[in-house]
Amino acid sequence: MKQLNSEQLQNIIGGNRWTNAYSAALGCAVPGVKYGKKLGGVWGAVIGGVGGAAVCGLAGYVRKG
């Protein structure tokens, strides 16, 4: 089995702690619901909340640093 060296480990994207993704998702879901409700009623709120959580949750997962 081949082992990774430290330079190869720097190229891995993602893998941050789950709390980073979770807090980022919650931080974007709330404004997504708020603005989505204004634009599209109940379904706008659902789409805005889920979309905001997905985008920011992914960003929190893959963010380096």
Swiss-Prot record:
A Pfam cross-reference name: Bacteriocin_IIc
UniProt keyword Translocase present: no
Propeptide position ranges: 1-15
BP GO terms, sorted: defense response to bacterium; killing of cells of another organism
Keywords: Antibiotic, Antimicrobial, Bacteriocin, Host cell membrane, Host membrane, Membrane, Secreted, Transmembrane, Transmembrane helix
Localization in the cell: Secreted; Host cell membrane
Keyword Membrane found: yes
GO cellular component: extracellular region; host cell plasma membrane; membrane
UniProt membrane topology term: Single-pass membrane protein
Transmembrane feature ranges: 39-59
Source domain of life: Bacteria
Family assignment from sequence similarity: Belongs to the bacteriocin class IIB family.
Subunit structure: Active lactobin is composed of two different peptides, one which is lactobin A.
NCBIfam families per the UniProt record, alphabetical: bacteriocin_sig
Physiological role: This heat stable bacteriocin inhibits the growth of closely related Lactobacillus species. It may act as a pore-forming protein, creating a channel in the cell membrane. It kills Lactobacillus helveticus ATCC 15009, but displays no activity towards Listeria species.
Descriptive protein name: Bacteriocin amylovorin-L
Organism: Lactobacillus amylovorus
Gene giving rise to this polypeptide: amyL
